[in-house]
């Protein structure tokens, strides 16, 4: 029976498999990823992967669940220390940019979920639903108080998501073309998004 022992750094075998699968799904795509290739890259037998994750579909579900949990923790952490109103929106955008810089494969997975559609995308959205629900309630309260312009909260969240992910996707495209964005350019892009969102949302300076 395979053990959970992994690398000398203490990373368990299941965690290593999930890391490798995430990287491959994010860069190569789900269909182009094979368990044989993952096993070869990890220097384990294919049966070891299948012991922990009985099929490629189960592996994808596990990657989605872990990635959604990591995203939720990062966003919840930024919100826990943020103030009210616009400051909370700004905190989320900054958190997403930091996460994309540290773990670009998460951004790649989000794009891949959009391409795959249901049931993978549905599972990812469902995992984030508690966070989305709280965000919708926050936006509704800000609109009711007159601090933000009136929009349908969930449609507004979708627009914010599309704007931020679109900008980050452009950054990843530049990397793919061999042009590594500088810290200054990333800060400038983040500032541009924040200015755009603030002008579209905030009614009170």
Give the ranges of each region predicted by the language model.
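C-terminal peripheral helix-coil segments that are non-catalytic and often amphipathic
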Residues: 1-3, 98, 102, 132-145, ...
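Amphipathic alpha-helical linker/stalk segments
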Residues: 2-5, 61-91, 132-138
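Helix-turn-helix
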Residues: 13-16, 20, 24-58, 62
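Conserved hydrophobic residue
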Residues: 30-31, 119, 148
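Hydrophobic alpha-helical connector segments
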Residues: 62, 76-105, 153-160, 187-190
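All-alpha amphipathic helical-bundle segments outside canonical DNA-binding/catalytic cores
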Residues: 87, 122-127, 143-161
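Amphipathic alpha-helical segments used for helix-helix packing
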Residues: 88, 100-122, 170-177
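Short alpha-helical scaffolding segments that buttress acidic/His motifs in well-ordered protein cores
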Residues: 93-96, 109-113, 160, 164, ...
């Amino acid at each position: 029976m395979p053990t959970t022992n992994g690398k000398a750094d203490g990373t368990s075998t299941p965690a290593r498999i999930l890391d490798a699968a995430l990287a491959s799904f994010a860069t190569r795509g789900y269909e182009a990823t094979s368990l044989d290739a993952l096993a070869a890259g990890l220097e384990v037998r294919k049966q070891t992967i299948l012991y922990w994750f009985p099929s490629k579909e189960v592996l994808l579900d596990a990657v989605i669940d872990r990635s959604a949990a990591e995203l939720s923790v990062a966003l919840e952490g930024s919100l826990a220390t943020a103030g009210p109103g616009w400051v909370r929106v700004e905190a989320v955008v900054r958190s997403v940019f930091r996460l994309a810089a540290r773990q670009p494969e998460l951004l790649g997975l989000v794009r891949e979920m959009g391409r795959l559609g249901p049931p993978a995308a549905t599972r990812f959205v469902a995992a984030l639903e508690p966070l989305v629900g709280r965000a919708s309630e926050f936006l509704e309260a800000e609109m009711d108080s007159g601090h933000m312009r009136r929009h349908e909260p969930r449609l507004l969240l979708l627009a914010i998501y599309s704007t931020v992910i679109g900008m980050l996707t452009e950054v990843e495209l530049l990397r793919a073309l061999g042009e590594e964005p500088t810290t200054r350019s990333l800060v400038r892009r983040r500032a541009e998004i924040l200015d755009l969102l603030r002008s579209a949302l905030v009614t009170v300076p």
